[in-house]
Amino acid sequence: MKNNFITTALLVTFTVCVPTAIAQQWQDVPAYAKSQTKNVLDRSIFYVPLFGSVYRAKFEVLMKKLPGIRGVVIHNHGCAGMWGWETTVAQFYYREGFAVVTPEFVTRDGNKLGCPGGTSEEMLKRAGERANEGVYTAKNPARLSARGDDNQEVIRWLKTMTDLPIFLSGHSEGCRTTYNWNRTEPQVKGGICHKQSVNRLYEHLWKWDTRLPMWSSNEDEDPWAGGSKQFPAVGFEEKFKDNPQNLTSFRFAGNSHDPLVRPGEVQSLRDWLSKQVSAPPIKSQNGFNYEDALQNIQNELKNNVK
């Protein structure tokens, strides 16, 4: 009961203390400069089917040599940066046969978290403060545009290796990064939004082309998505009213912000991915001998020595 009271109080703080006009202003800081994309790959973790988490040189070689990769997912973390739940999501994708890149945005020079704190209650409270300030918050269009710049640079790099379909994924603030995407990039084939809404305080951020398919998940009373018993988290149905066939929405009557934890949630996303990509997940080596790739990786590592 006490925890429910705290959550409700913090939700009120988070939603009421944020004037819409301030939130919609573009507020730039050096951390959002486009020049900071130059080290995005140094701020990223990479995953490959069968292998899991790998370093960059190994990723680059296996993208060209490992047969059967279904596509590439760029997964964008939430307001707290790269934590365990983001890794859990990335692991789901690679086990489904996708290569994955997870850029960490908050480690750009001079950047800050959108929700600092040592407990979930403190983080939610301080997320409201950051939103009220209007700079280091997902409500700031400049922040999401900068995250889009990071994604664009990752895509540019990926295109030097593969023409596989690319999917933009995100959790929480990373979901807002995904639905803020409006750049012409034919290789991007869809979006995936974990546990985030598009309520009125965030509508100014929506730029997604609804001709592209999207999978989304939301819990009715998730405080991080602005949800409560009286006012459930707002899904994307209204945004997709002209193309409803392109939205797959997973809803749950709960209050968790954690991705891929509810019955049926994993299967829903798995089914959606299979509709987008006809190739099946990689279940075995299929004759691939890792030793055949070693020389290429060794050469990459030699070339990378400064």
Where are these regions (language model features)?
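Bacterial N-terminal signal peptides
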Residues: 8-17
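Sec/Tat signal peptide C-region and signal peptidase I cleavage site
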Residues: 18-23
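N-terminal cap/lid segment of alpha/beta-hydrolase-fold proteins
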Residues: 24-66
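Serine-hydrolase catalytic machinery in alpha/beta-hydrolase-like enzymes
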Residues: 50-63, 69-160
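Glycine-rich His-Gly loop
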Residues: 75-79, 172, 219
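Primarily recognizes the serine-hydrolase "nucleophile elbow" in alpha/beta-hydrolase
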Residues: 149-210
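The feature captures the conserved acid-bearing segment of alpha/beta-hydrolase catalytic domains
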Residues: 190-257
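C-terminal catalytic histidine-bearing segment of alpha/beta-hydrolase fold enzymes
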Residues: 241-306
